[in-house]
């Protein structure tokens, strides 16, 4: 629990914004991965694949926070 008083409305707004940012970042990584697959750049493909997995985990975490605030 935070020591700071922030309204649930503001928290939800911030978390939804973060969720959108994560989805955009994931999409950018997928696009870059597609290009690097075509170029045969395996090291970059592996790095981007790892980034995509981290972003997916972050999305799940943010979605859980949103769900908890909506309960």
Predicted regions and their residues:
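Short E/K-rich amphipathic alpha-helical oligomerization segments
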Residues: 20-50
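Amphipathic alpha-helical coiled-coil segments
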Residues: 22-29, 51-71
């Amino acid at each position: 629990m935070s020591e700071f008083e922030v309204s649930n409305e503001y928290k939800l707004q911030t978390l939804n914004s973060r969720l959108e940012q994560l989805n955009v970042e994931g999409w950018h990584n997928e696009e870059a991965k597609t290009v690097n697959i075509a170029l045969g750049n395996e090291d970059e493909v592996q790095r981007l694949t790892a980034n995509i997995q981290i972003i997916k985990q972050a999305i799940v975490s943010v979605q859980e926070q949103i769900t908890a605030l909506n309960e």
